[in-house]
C-alpha cells in the first residue's frame, strides 16, 4: 500500500512535469500539433498549457490534503 507521503511525492513530481510543459509550450517556441486521420492538423498548444495549468492547481490541492 502506498503511503500519503509517497502519494504527495508523486503529486509533486507530476506538478513539476506540468510546469516544465508549460515552460516548453507557453513560450511559443514549441507547438503541439495534432494530426487527424484525414491528414488535417490542429494546433492544440493553448489547450496543453491550459490543461497543465489546471493540473498544477489540482496537484497542489492533493498535496495539501495528503500532508495535512
Residue ranges and their predicted role:
Residues 21-22, 44-68:
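Amphipathic alpha-helical coiled-coil segments
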Residues 10, 27, 37-39, 62-65:
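Low-complexity, intrinsically disordered/propeptide-like segments
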Residues 3-7, 30, 64-68:
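Short, charged, intrinsically disordered terminal tails
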Residues 16-47:
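Short E/K-rich amphipathic alpha-helical oligomerization segments
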